[in-house]
Amino acid sequence: RLGFSGHGFNDFRPEDQEVWCMRPEDVPKYQAEVRALAEKYKDKIEILCGVEQDACSTSTTEGFDYVIGSVHYVEKNGMYYCVDESPEVLEQGIREGFGGDVYALTKRFFEIEAEVVSRTNATFIGHFDLVTKFNEGSRYFDPMDKRYRMAALSAMDALLETGRPFEINTGGMYRGLRTEPYPSLQLLRDLKERRGKILLSSDSHDGASLGFRFAEVAQAAKEIGFGSVLVLKKDGWEEFKLL
């Protein structure tokens, strides 16, 4: 109905401290169910079985078609602070973990982000600047401040060396938290200047969000200068021109 030739399912890899991740014993069942769907609908649509692996996770990623590498936590002195659970939890992390210095938190976030591929063996990089989830209108920090920019661009440069593409993620827009995708339009300009590759992702947690505002963000990417987007297939990446 939406015109997709393929679809990727991905759940969060098990984490001891979080109830919203898969339980370890559920992973084989999840993989089997997605494989069954792939077989059932193979003549209509290609279905891949993926996983979103946080940089702090130590779980294996074996048995998946692809891995999304992401950062949801910043670690400081043995404590883990979630950046995307709620504004209150973010504020707690800024206060308790970083002495009220939000730029120290964003710097640590991007230090971990820089290692997300080496930590997760990611197929692609998910929501690169997730730390901005609750920062609409510069609520907590200025994304053009040099302290933020230097940390973000350092991470971007490190990840570009891995050759992995960056997703343009519309999930925050769908949830009404952001007016721009992840990465922000400014960071997408930086990515284009560095000849990075992109793909589109709606980070869907429900059917209604599938492909959310793809046409709009694809047009924005084209205006920035991107000529194509990548699409992940069973046999690897395919590149499609932005029209």
What is each model feature region?
Residues R1-G3, E46-L48, D65-I68, T123-I125, ...:
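Structural preference for beta-strand elements that scaffold enzyme active sites
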Residues R35-K42, S59-I68, V117-N121, D157-G163, ...:
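Acidic (Asp/Glu)-rich catalytic clusters
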Residues F4, F9, G69-D157, P165-R175:
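Divalent metal-binding pocket/active-site signature
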Residues A55-C56, E111-I112, L185:
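A generic local structural motif
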Residues K133, S138-L243:
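Charged catalytic cores and adjacent phosphate/nucleic-acid-binding surfaces used
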